[in-house]
Design a protein with these regions (language model features):
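Positively charged n-region of N-terminal signal peptides that target proteins for export
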Residues: 1-4
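Glycine-rich, small/hydroxylated-residue low-complexity segments
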Residues: 6, 14, 20-446
Length: 446
């Protein structure tokens, strides 16, 4: 019996030691996660506390988001920093150093002037909850769910949101490997008598993977980075009593952006099941395009400039940029755009466009007039019926314009179809349609 009791004591000591070791490892990694937030420009952590337990621990801290960061994100001045309280429940076990640990977080707004307003929208000052799965090696899967908004005011507006979620996957160095956004529903309704309008958004699912992980400290910077993205939107409707209605159904988007030797290239495909403009409905929208030879450092400099513009002053967006120099840097890389397919339908009839454009041989420092010597462009347009019938009530003026375009040679009749081929002629510095008439003639009244 003594041997059994001794063995049990040894087992208990080993288990207790393992649990203690595991809880220490969890605390080390938890504190590393919190400390990394300070590396994000515009974030500051304070009042950090941690209560260690064997199988569960608690932690909390204040997260201050600077008004300068908010200004860059919102595009206008903000009166004060935002102060959030982040309260965490950390679950771990004896095998935490193998299996990792879970963090359940509650995020509350603390600003006195704001939290009562937030509570009127959300029912409390809790703006979001989060679940983090973290391994001791450092990998993290973070999922944030924003509190649903259910606000109605008969005099001003209605605001409703449901299941707005955001997620990040981080590697052991806290670099972002992927990001995702999900929205079940957002409904905004402006009840102002002078400008009644609605925005309805449903079924959003956006997933982006970064080919080269993005440093968490640079997550709010506007930079081109290699990625693969997919997105779906079930419904997007913009309803306005004055300006009319636009609705998109079943939108799908895929994009791939690559960078090699500071040159970027992208391939994008957009598909939309239906596009309704007032009472006119188009279906089967497809855009398949490619862009090549993008000067990534130059574009990033422009994006950096745009993100730091003081929109509340009269400062020009391009202040500090030499536009001739910037254009030269972009054009000397021989950029090109190719639209393999742009098409959509009205009933059974479709309109289709192909386009291929590029700048070749431009030298930095040349006059921008040299663009007209370096430009190549060609394309094709076809419509299964007349443009007047295709666009119908959306552009009734087309009934008068189309016959003139046909007689002048910009369009050709091909049975029931209307077609056109066009190509840029560098000698004439003009786009020639159907090898017959130039675009300049159109602007000069034929």
């Amino acid at each position: 019996m003594k041997k059994v009791i001794s063995a049990l004591i040894v087992v208990i000591v080993i288990v207790a030691g393992a649990v203690y070791f595991a809880s220490n490892k969890v605390e080390e990694n938890y504190q590393r996660i919190v400390d990394r937030l300070n590396d994000v420009n515009g974030f500051k952590v304070s009042e950090n506390s941690y209560q260690k337990g064997f199988f569960g621990s608690k932690g909390s801290f204040d997260l201050i988001v600077s008004k300068d960061l908010l200004k860059n994100l919102a595009g206008k001045d903000v009166d004060e920093d935002l102060n959030f309280k982040v309260e965490n429940e950390i679950s771990h076990s004896v095998l935490a150093f193998v299996n990792g640990f879970d963090i359940d977080s509650k995020i509350s707004i603390q600003n006195e002037a704001i939290k009562n307003i937030v509570a009127s929208f959300l029912g409390s000052n809790v703006v979001a909850t989060a679940k983090t799965k973290a391994s001791v090696s450092g990998d993290k899967d973070v999922n944030v769910k924003f509190s649903d908004i259910d606000f109605s005011d008969k005099q001003t507006m209605n605001v409703h949101t449901k299941d707005v979620k955001f997620g990040l996957k981080l590697d052991e160095k806290d670099n972002v490997n992927s990001a995702k956004l999900g929205v079940e529903k957002v409904a905004l309704k402006d009840l102002n008598e002078e400008n009644k309008a609605e925005v309805n958004l449903e079924g959003v699912d956006i997933d982006t993977s970064y080919t080269v992980p993005v440093e968490i400290s640079k997550i709010f910077e506007s930079k081109l980075a290699p990625y693969v993205a997919k997105a779906k939107i079930k419904k997007l409707a913009l309803l306005d009593e004055k300006d009319g209605n636009v609705a998109l159904d079943d939108l799908e988007y895929s994009s791939k952006f690559e960078v090699s030797n500071d040159l970027g290239s992208s391939k994008d495909v957009v598909k939309i099941g239906a596009v309704a403009v007032n009472k006119v409905k188009f279906t089967d929208f497809i855009l398949d395009s490619k862009i090549a030879n993008i000067n990534v450092p130059t574009i990033n400099n422009i994006l950096d400039r745009l993100s730091n513009v003081n929109v509340d002053s009269n400062e020009s967006v391009f202040a500090g940029l030499n536009l001739d120099e910037v254009m030269g840097q972009i054009l000397e890389k021989n950029p090109s755009v190719k639209v393999d397919r742009l098409s959509f339908k009205n009933g059974d009839n479709a309109i289709k466009l192909k386009l291929d454009a590029a700048i070749n041989g431009f030298k930095s420092g040349e006059s921008q007039l040299a663009i007209f010597d370096k430009l190549s462009l060609n394309g094709e347009l076809s419509v299964d019926e007349t443009l007047a019938k295709f666009f119908d009530t959306l552009f009734p003026e087309m009934t008068l314009i189309e016959p003139t375009l046909i007689s002048a040679g910009y369009l050709k009749e091909d049975g029931k179809k209307v077609v056109s081929k066009f190509k840029y002629d560098p000698n004439k510095k003009d786009i020639i349609f159907n090898e017959k008439v130039g675009l300049q003639n159109l602007f000069m009244g034929f």
